[in-house]
Structures are given as structure tokens and as C-alpha cells.
């Protein structure tokens, strides 16, 4: 395919000159029709099986004098990239996307050589694993090698401090070897059955295609590939949280068509993407669309036209790319990275390709997709075709020698495991040993007085003013501290010591029971002031959307990335565990044992028989306890404000980083018998 087939009209200024000559309404209408609907007529399916839909608007005006303009637009918008951007309403963004589609240059020097090498190396690696390990599940990328070019180009162009990758099964092993820098010998050892962690650690570990990796590529770019469970998309919010806690990170999410369309956590994460507390500067989503999920055809897998239609809700542009056009992959990657740099928001690239081997190496795809598989069998190898087209000869000698040595090596424990004190035999005893969390009483009084001070010039609600007055009375020794005061003291004291605090939850800033008031509102102009500002380290205090699964995953990921920070998330009621159970099971309670991921996340589940019905009143203590094993979790039910103060501070000052689930009270928040003198929060 000629380079000019997807670079404007072969001339970056061609369309501008055509429009400059004819600027009437009919010309503009034709251009707008192609910009909005042309992607449905683009040649993005290499098999030619997906139906193409030519919108009537593209041919509504058949005036002969519009012919040159129509031809130019068809070359731009009906080529190997489908520009699905009509749902983007911001005028500046629309103009930017139109310019990106209608102008541009060919691949930069060296890009085609790199692409040709990647295609050839991927084909060799996939062939070697099939020949040498015929029963190993690698979820081959055979038939979708263009995805390697796409992902590699994104990482290279972004050149971020670290690419944080939430991945997928498809092509996982090849990506580790060729994109992410995992040592080949270690990969093959894991495929042969060697544990990825020393047995002396006592860790459960996982199958090879679930494992993560953190290292440096040959070009010096750092990558962090998150481990994931078979519930694939649940890793995406975890990766996003880690990206937020990693300065200069690039969040890169890899999806397959069935997963991004079918798993609701993807929509949840996109709903978070434009909210300031969850901002990561834009996530680049790469979707591998094989038009089949395991054995399920696309027609049975989703109602939407495309797999990534969830992105339309947040007006993220969606570029559809022909998986057999590496030059189109390079261009789409450049557009995605530049979009993120310009607008700091999400963008989606959908690469349409196919699976030569079915779902995995022991699958028989002809049982369910015989027509598709016949078309696949007729396709030539992309690597050889691309190299021949551009007269390139990739040198694979060093790669093949390394690969051959790795496959011949005897399986051995490939990892020294590093430091894992949370899995040591004495972990439970260390968790039960109370750290020093108390503070001098005069220090507590000073902090509490600041927490009770009325912000200058703020017209308070009368009940909020009384709330602060009670705080000042506690600071003066006229009354013991209630639950909310002890909690605020824990936060303020950590901030003063230099530990950042991130407290969030569903209606939690005020408190679902009006007990907290961490942010005060001016009754006249609505101005808001956080009572935790100015104590030292950064305090984040905010309400979260009515989203449990993605929010918990994000908060967990952030706690993994930043061990200095106290991360606390509160559900509105404890039974909301029902909705976040997947990320709780897979990561919060199982992340350390499987993947050595440590976290001090604190999860608050309001719990108690207070007239809410049998389910709405419970945090399901039995389910949480069922997930406890090998000292993986703190489960607490504090009975006094002082208990709660020490528990929160212990999450920062304790000897081991462990998640804590707190079954927090409702009736006790204002119970006259549930008060603590400041002396109970003292040292010793």
C-alpha cells in the first residue's frame, strides 16, 4: 500500500488548497460528512469480512465539480485508519483531529526498520514457542503482529518516565520478550514450569501469562507491566492508580475486543478519567479487535457497533487501524501520543486483526469460526510482506541466538524474589505488635484547636459552626473527643509529620451521617475550604462517584505506588462490598501472595444493625474473614475514638504494609458513651 494512501491526499496541503478555492456551504457539508462518517467506510479489516457502512451523507451531493474534493476526502478517511471522532464536541479538539487526519508526514527515519524487525522477531518467537513448547498456553499474537508495532510506537514516542501497562492475555509472552524487556531465559523458564518466585518465600505465584514485570527496555525506557488475574480488565483501574502515584508516567491499557466491550469496569474507569482526583494526564487505550472472544462472535458479544464504544461517553477519539498496515499503526500511535500531550485526556486505538491459532495453542477455531479461519489461512505473513514492500532485511541473528539459548536452558528458579517481609513466618506476629502511634497531649490539643477554627470570612451553616465550637471545646479539655474528632486528629497529625493523606468515599467529605465535615461551604457564595489544608503534607479530601469496582482498584493502585501516603476509601454503606468484590479478592487480599504487591490501603465499611435492612446494614464480615490467610489483611472493629486514631496512624507507622478493612460504626458516631479523652491518644 502506498504511503500517500493514508497521509492526507499525499500532500499535507492538498485539502486546504481545495477548500481555499471553493469555500461554499456544499463543500463544507461534504467535508463534515466525511469527517463524521468516513470511518465506517474505512478499510480497517484485513480479512474484509467486517461489513463496511457507507453513510448516505457521503454521496448526498454528487455534483461533478465536487469530484476532486470527494476523491481527496475518500483517500483520507476511507483508508487504513478510521477516524471515529464525530462524538467529540469541543471545537478545538475537533479542529485538532481534523488537522491530524488531513495533514501529516510519513514514518520518521528508522521507524520502518524498527517495525520490520518487530514483525519478523514476533513471528519467529511465536513459531519457536509453538514448536518447542507445543502444549504451553501463550495466547499467541500470530495474526496480530501489527499490535506490537502499535504499542512499541506509543511507548517510544511518549518517552515517559515510566510506561505503566495494564495488559491482556493475548500476546502477553511475546510482548514481555520484545516490548517490555523481560529476560528471555526467565520467560522460557516460566513457560517450562519453573516458579517465578523462590519457594522459600511461600508465595502462591501465578501462571506465566498473569505475571507482571518492571524493568528497562533496550532503548532505556522504563516500563511497569502490572500482573493481572483472568478477570482481565480489573487490572485497568489498578494500573491507573499506580500511574497517578508515579510522576511522569504514561498509563497504557491493553484490551481485547470482547473484554473492553463486556466488562463494566472499563466504563467505570473512563467515567473517572475526567475527574480531577483520578487524573493521570490521559490514558492511551490499545484495543486488539479479533472480532471474536474465545469462541463468541462479535454479534453475540456486544450491542454496540464497535468494541470501544464506551469511549464515546467521555468523548475520547477512537482511531480504527488496519492491523496489516504497519505504517498506519505508526501514524495512529503518533496521533494518540500527541493528543494526550496536547489535551491530557483519553484516546483509543482499535487495531483490527485476527488469530491464526484460535484462542490459544490447543484450541480449534474451525469448530465455531470456519469461514473466518479459512480467510485467515489465506493471508500471507505480514513480516515478509512489509519487509519486501520497503526493501528491508531485518537482522535477527542476535535475537535468534538469545532465543535459542533461552529455550535450551534447563528450567530453574528465574527470580531471586527480592525482599518480601510481609510473607515471612513472623508476619502475623509483627502485625499484632502495636507500633508507637501516640502523641503528646499538648500536641493533640494544638492540632484539634486548628481543626476547630472557623475559616476567616466564611459564612458557615449554623450547625457547622456548632460542630467547630464543639471541636474547640474538646481542644480546651472541656469535653472528650468524639469519633470524627479522633479521625481528623489522625489525619492532621500524619500531615504534620510529612505523610500525605488521601481520604475519599461516597458522600464521605461531609459524612453519610453528617458526622465529619472535612470541607466547609460558604452559605452565600458556595466557596469551599478543607479543614485539613495547611498542616504540612498534601491532603486530598473528596467525594467519589457511585462507582465501587474501579474506584477501589484505583485507590489500591495508588497505595501500591506511593508507600508514604495514607490512602483511605469509605463506602457509603458496608454492603457495597457486593460490587467491589472482584478487585477486593484479586488485588487487595491476594496481590501480595501472588505478585508481591504491598499496600497499606484502608477500607472503611460502615456496619451495624441500624434499621437499614438485613443486607444494607452489614459490611459482610464473614466474606472479609474468609479472604484472610497468611497475614494478608488487617480486619478491625474499633470500639472507641482513640482506638480508631491509633489504627489509622498505624497504617503509616506499622512495620509491615498491609491493607486494613475497618468495620466502622454508625450509632457510635454520636453515642454519649463512645468518647475518648485525649490522654488515650497519647504516647506509650
Show where each model-derived region lies:
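Extended, charge-enriched "interface" segments that sit outside catalytic cores
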Residues: 2-148
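Conserved phosphate/anionic-ligand binding catalytic regions in large, soluble enzymes, centered on
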Residues: 31-46, 149, 153-179, 236, ...
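Conserved pre-catalytic core of RNA-dependent polymerases
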Residues: 88-148, 152-207, 509, 516, ...
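Active-site cores of enzymes that catalyze phosphoryl transfer or operate on phosphate-rich substrates
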Residues: 104-126, 188-240, 244, 638, ...
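Glycine-rich ThDP/TPP pyrophosphate-binding loop and its adjacent helix/strand module
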Residues: 150, 226-412, 575, 610-612, ...
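Cofactor-binding active-site loop characterized by glycine-rich and histidine/acidic residues
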Residues: 161-164, 168-315, 319, 513-562
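Hard-cation-handling environments
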Residues: 393-501
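ASCE RecA-like P-loop NTPase motor cores
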Residues: 495, 509, 527-684
